[in-house]
Amino acid sequence: KLFSKPLRALCVQCFSEMRQSGITTVGEFHYFHHDKETDFAMDRAVLEAASEVGIRIVLLHAFYKHGGFGKQLGGGQLRFSTQDLETWWKHIDQLSVEVDGSMQRVGTVAHSVRAVDIETIRDIAIGSLQRGMPMHIHLEEQRQEIEKCIQAHGVTPMALLNDGIEVSPMVTAVHCTHTAAADMEQWLALGGNVCLCPLTEANLADGVSNMHRIVKQGGCVSLGSDSNARISMLEEMRWMEYAQRLTREERGVCVDNFGSMANYLIDVATKNGARCLGLPVGEISIGKLADFTVVDIEHSQLSGATPETLGDMLCCGADNAVIVRTIISGN
């Protein structure tokens, strides 16, 4: 069992590593729940850790009800169990009032179509939109989930969401490793976001998402560190592109309208991440919060960089060693 005190210590370590790697905001996909509905110990452990480290956080509180399509929870899943939807919303609304609004927000998670029925996912999407909260959901990370969803519902998980909930720029599908082209096209056209986690997806041998079609359609895709086995935003950025090179046998898949890989990947790690978490960050401009990362341009890994080549050298050849510090809310 994992209790609040060791959870807090683990979060402090994790969030500290995030800041050291240049990450200024964490969207914590949080589904360790509590002994009773009035117990906020696990939530507070995560929030207190973020406060101690000084990282901005959106606590994405997960609803988790089933152990699979038509199955009860069992074993280790029992700790993730959510009570009824009404109690869950009361918990979230109370937590939203208690958090430090300058650095902390609350969002929602419907864990997956296998852990939450589509009617409940629809209600969560509606409630999140009404509250101005971002909503995330695991989707099509592994082929088995798709096959079982088709057996249960006759359609893929993405098709189930496209037709079953109100998709908006406040809704993010995490992974989409094996999403069909037509389903992805509809999701992006409806305004939905995608979050990829290249290092975790590689670690778990999940597969590689088709970024080519997402880029071609101009979809909003962000990056997550997921399992945190290795925390490096520069590596996540790099492998978003490199994985495509390996599968498509071509370079420059993840590029902007001007053919720049660096500009595209930097936007993915900043502006797009901000949109997926519903935060006014991600760029240095009037009206945005002063969150940014300082890079040592004289580091040996960036030796010889010019204004024109710095971005590419950062994305292709640098690691956490070039990160000097992170500035969050000007501090």
What feature does the model see in each segment?
Residues 69, 143-155, 183-188, 205-214, ...:
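Histidine/acidic-residue-rich catalytic or RNA/ligand-binding cores of hydrolases
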Residues 22, 50, 108, 138, ...:
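Divalent metal-coordination and catalytic microenvironments
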Residues 127-134, 166-169, 186-195, 216-221, ...:
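Glycine-enriched alpha-helix->loop->beta-strand junction motifs that scaffold or abut catalytic
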Residues 170-180, 196-202, 224:
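Catalytic beta/alpha-barrel core
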Residues 1-42:
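Metal-associated gating/positioning segment near the N- to mid-region
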Residues 289-331:
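C-terminal cap of metal-dependent C-N hydrolases
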Residues 163-166, 212-301, 317:
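His/Asp/Glu-enriched, well-ordered alpha-helical/loop segment
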Residues 35-180:
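Metal-coordinating catalytic core of metallo-dependent amide/deamination hydrolases
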